[in-house]
Amino acid sequence: MTSEQQVEAALKSYEDVDSWKTIIFLYNAALKEVGTKLEILNDEFQHVHQYNPIEHIKTRIKTPESIVKKLRRYGHETSIENMVRYINDIAGVRLICSFTSDIYRLAEMIGNQSDLKVLSIKDYIKNPKESGYKSYHMLVSVPIFLSDSVVDTKVEIQIRTIAMDFWASLEHKIYYKYEGNTPEYIKQELKECADLVA
């Protein structure tokens, strides 16, 4: 059975489709909550300082196929419980800024939101990945208020400059072009470019 067939089989094996839909509903709601907060912070910054630190905001929900592949890569069975427990980037927000200083200013503003709980921070700007990748990642939990309950839902926020975003996009495309076997000389050139644009 090919890996694609395994993914299809795993997706079909979700016993409770309603649970799957509910989880995705919660992640979409969390993206809306976080997106609204970020737009308000950006508007406030413009009002007070006549400057917008956020160039643009991108959001996404991981596809079911991507979720299954990631669970398998981590050695976990495909289940709703494992998806929620082990995959932190099902809901993702990417903030693109002009300057590195904007990244840290935004991270501080996000961290000061009383109803967002910062679960973890990975600063790949101060500590870039070996490949040269640079970005600031925050994993936050946002309360989703439903008619009969409140559900804390995780959202990964990536904050990076325009240059860092361009580099990350290029690296991603090259990785898939070479199917994960990027030639060493290209890796080295990418690393040098990352050092230049940061």
What residue ranges belong to the model's regions?
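Short N-terminal helix-initiation segments at or just after the protein's N-terminus
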Residues: 26-42, 77-86, 98-103
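A glycine-rich, hydrophobic loop/mini-helix early in the fold
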Residues: 50-91
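An acidic, glycine-/histidine-flanked metal-binding catalytic module
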Residues: 1-31, 35-44, 156-198
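Solvent-exposed alpha-helical segments within well-ordered globular domains of core cellular machineries
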Residues: 32, 36, 65, 69, ...
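Short secondary-structure junctions
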Residues: 43-45, 75-76, 114-119
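Short aromatic/hydrophobic contact patches that present stacked aromatics
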Residues: 92-96
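Long beta-strand-rich cores associated with HINT superfamily self-processing modules
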Residues: 84, 97-198
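Charged, low-complexity, helix/coiled-coil-prone segments
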Residues: 4-15, 37-55, 80-83, 139-148
